[in-house]
Regions:
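A penicillin-recognizing enzyme superfamily signal
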Residues: 11-201
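Surface-exposed aromatic
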Residues: 1-6
Length: 202
């Protein structure tokens, strides 16, 4: 594993990113993405139904804490336009009222724009970019993931919610029983510098 992967220094596919992010929605269980749910013959008889490959990789409490942090992205961060009507952009009136955890992303020189978003039973990701790294937007205003990828995710999710057969959740993420991590992003903390040298000056 390359440590710089967290900074976006390593190329990664949408499949890999969505698979990794969905681990948090799955309470710490990684489910390897699978494109085939089942194979049926012409009479509807199931010939093959691959079993999901799963692995416990993150503690449930940690996964829930990360989900709550990523909910902040859509409540008051770069993904907040999903909640309040598109941030003034025409034709992007999403106004989702349900909890959504997500993360926008923008690479060097605005070459890539990302948005990965999750609800309890669906994780989806959008990448806007070009294999030619020389192709990029001129400014972060236009090239950031919140401007390029997030609107596409919003349109996709509106269509998912419009299709009742998909049964995409609007419920809150499940809180683990016996949660041991206190998730509090609002109470200010007093920072004490233990390396400071005491003086008489105020």
């Amino acid at each position: 594993v390359q440590p710089s992967i967290a900074l976006g220094a390593v190329d990664i596919t949408v499949e890999e990113m969505v698979g990794a992010m969905s681990t948090f929605a799955n309470q710490g269980v990684y489910v390897k993405p699978n494109f085939i749910i089942k194979i049926e013959d012409k009479n509807g008889v199931v010939i093959d139904q691959p079993m999901p490959v799963t692995k416990d990789v993150v503690n449930k409490d940690v996964a829930y804490a990360v989900v709550k942090l990523m909910e902040g992205v859509t409540q008051s961060g770069t993904g907040s336009r999903l909640k309040w009507g598109g941030a003034g952009f025409r034709n992007y009136d999403y106004s989702f009222g349900n909890p959504i955890a997500g993360k926008t992303g923008t690479s060097q020189n605005n070459s890539d724009g990302w948005f990965i978003g999750m609800v309890p039973n669906l994780a989806a990701g959008i990448w806007v970019g070009n294999e030619d790294r020389a192709a990029h937007f001129k400014s972060t205003h236009y090239g950031q993931g919140a401007t390029t990828a997030l609107p596409i995710w919003g349109i996709f999710m509106k269509k998912c919610y419009a299709d009742s057969d998909l049964d995409v959740s609007k419920e809150p993420f499940e809180r683990p029983d016996d949660l041991k991590i206190k998730v509090d992003c609002w109470t200010p903390k007093k920072v004490v510098d233990s390396t400071a040298v005491p003086t008489d000056e105020p």
